[in-house]
Amino acid sequence: MKIKNSYLVIASLLYPISFISTAASLTVEQRLAALENDLQETKQELQRYKEQEKKNKAITLVRVNSAADADNKSNAFNVAKTATPIA
């Protein structure tokens, strides 16, 4: 178990170093293009999260409204039935 953990520690330390050596071999234009690509992917992921949050919020509102409707239907004091019209 200790050996596995030590490999994980070594791998986690070497992982950023591999990016440094790769980044050093890239031109400024290539690095900029890679950063722009990452930014675009991040924006798309953020948009997906926003859309999912809107869906979740809509589902929650529907559940709350349907629960409120069910509660109103079971309410013993129904205003529509007991109210008298004003002459």
Swiss-Prot record:
Pfam families reported for this sequence: Sugarporin_N (PF11471)
One GO CC term on file: pore complex
Domain of life assignment: Bacteria
Membrane topology type: Multi-pass membrane protein
Any one GO BP annotation for this protein: monoatomic ion transport
Family as reported in the entry's similarity comment: Belongs to the porin LamB (TC 1.B.3) family.
Protein name, as recorded: Putative outer membrane protein ArbH
